[in-house]
Regions:
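Class I SAM-dependent methyltransferase SAM/SAH-binding core
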Residues: 1-35
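Short alpha-helix immediately C-terminal to the canonical SAM-binding loop
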Residues: 13-14, 54, 77
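A short acidic, Gly/Pro-enriched loop at the edge of an enzyme's catalytic core
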Residues: 33-45
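Residues lining the SAM
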Residues: 43, 48-51, 70
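A short, conserved alpha-helix within the catalytic core of class I
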Residues: 49-61
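Conserved class I S-adenosyl-L-methionine
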Residues: 58, 66-99
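C-terminal helical/coil "lid" or tail adjacent to the Rossmann-like core of SAM-dependent
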Residues: 102-105, 114-128
């Protein structure tokens, strides 16, 4: 495979691997702080909502490679928070400096998602 993906949750990795019918991705259970790839092996690293492990990210991305990351916006999962908390709160969003990387562009992304069935329970279980 030309792509590798990992998550700390074995359940998330199993679910994603089941959906990968073409086996285009090599899936693994791993922490952001111990990425199972060689030094300077990645042309691009994409981090979605995981803890920032800047030193590890810099280790695996090739010189001149890209690091793309997504952080929760101010109203990320706000609907869940309205149900779960007496006083829902907005997230604080700030640009973060990652040693070894330069911020190229910041692109806000907004979308609404409706969840149903057992996915609702999963979403509540992972919401801080």
């Amino acid at each position: 495979p030309s792509a590798a993906a990992f998550d700390i949750s074995k359940f998330a990795v199993k679910a994603a691997a089941r959906r990968d019918k073409g086996h285009a991705v090599q899936w693994a259970v791993a922490s952001s702080f111990a990425i199972p790839v060689a030094d300077a092996a990645a042309d691009c690293l994409v981090d979605i909502f995981s803890p920032a492990a800047a030193q590890e990210f810099a280790r695996v991305v090739k010189p001149g490679g890209a690091f793309v990351f997504a952080v929760p916006g101010p109203r990320h999962l706000y609907g869940v928070k309205e149900v779960r908390y007496e006083r829902p709160y907005e997230n604080t969003v700030q640009d973060v400096a990652y040693p070894g990387f330069a911020l190229g562009q910041r692109i806000p992304v907004h979308s609404m998602l409706t969840v149903t069935g057992s996915t609702i329970l999963d979403l509540f279980a992972m919401t801080p």
